[in-house]
Amino acid sequence: MATAGMNDVKNGMKILVNNEPAVISETEFIKPGKGQAFTRVRYRFIKSGRTVEMTMKATDDVEVADVVDTNMDYMYSDGEYWHFMDPETFEQVQADKAGMGGAEKWLKGEESCIVTLFNGSPIFVQPPNFVELKITETDPGVRGDTSGGGGKPATLETGAVVRVPLFVNQDEIIKVDTRSGEYSSRVK
C-alpha cells in the first residue's frame, strides 16, 4: 500500500484507518510557538458515515486507500444483490445491502449511479440526485383538508415512502430528490 506524508494530505483524499476506507474532509496545519508542528485531520468513514477528528505529528504517514468512484448503470436486483455495469468496459459488479447504503429504495432500473469501489468491490452507491418514480399508493386529497400541514404519505413503485402535496394523485409520476428523500415536482 502507498503512504503519504502529512504535508501531502489534502481535503478529499481517501485514506485507510484501521483497514477501513475514509475520506478527509478537513485538514489544519498548526505550528505552535513552542514544540513540534502537527496537523489536525477530520475524516469521514465511507461505509458508516461516521466523522472522526485526529491529531497527527508532521512526521507521521497515512496509508492511501485504493478507493475509486466509478459511474455505473444499475441493471437489476436478484433479491440479495444489486447488479451494476460499467458502460465503457461492460464490467459488472454486485453490491450487497450494506454496500447500497439505502440507495436501493430509489433505483428501478437503468439509472446511472456513482459506485465507490474499495479493492474492486462496491462499498457505497450514490443514486442520481433526482429520480422520476410512479406513485403506487396514496390517499386521495380532500378539498379543504389542509389542517395537517398540507401533505400526505405516498408509496412509490420502488417501495419508498415520501410526503407529497395534497393535489398529487395515485399513478402520477413525480420527481424525488434522493439526497433528502423529499418530493420535488410532478413530471408532465
Curated annotation (Swiss-Prot):
GO molecular-function terms, A-Z: translation elongation factor activity
Pathways involved: Protein biosynthesis; polypeptide chain elongation
Protein keywords: Cytoplasm, Elongation factor, Hydroxylation, Protein biosynthesis
Cellular location(s): Cytoplasm
Modified residues (N6-(3,6-diaminohexanoyl)-5-hydroxylysine): 34
Cystines in this chain: none
BP GO annotations: peptide biosynthetic process
Keyword Cytoplasm applies: yes
Modifications made to the protein after synthesis: May be beta-lysylated on the epsilon-amino group of Lys-34 by the combined action of EpmA and EpmB, and then hydroxylated on the C5 position of the same residue by EpmC (if this protein is present). Lysylation is critical for the stimulatory effect of EF-P on peptide-bond formation. The lysylation moiety may extend toward the peptidyltransferase center and stabilize the terminal 3-CCA end of the tRNA. Hydroxylation of the C5 position on Lys-34 may allow additional potential stabilizing hydrogen-bond interactions with the P-tRNA.
Gene3D superfamilies: 2.30.30.30, Nucleic acid-binding proteins (2.40.50.140)
Gene Ontology cellular-component annotations: cytoplasm
Membership in a protein family: Belongs to the elongation factor P family.
Described purpose of this protein according to its UniProt entry: Involved in peptide bond synthesis. Alleviates ribosome stalling that occurs when 3 or more consecutive Pro residues or the sequence PPG is present in a protein, possibly by augmenting the peptidyl transferase activity of the ribosome. Modification of Lys-34 is required for alleviation.
The name this protein goes by in its record: Elongation factor P
The gene coding this protein: efp
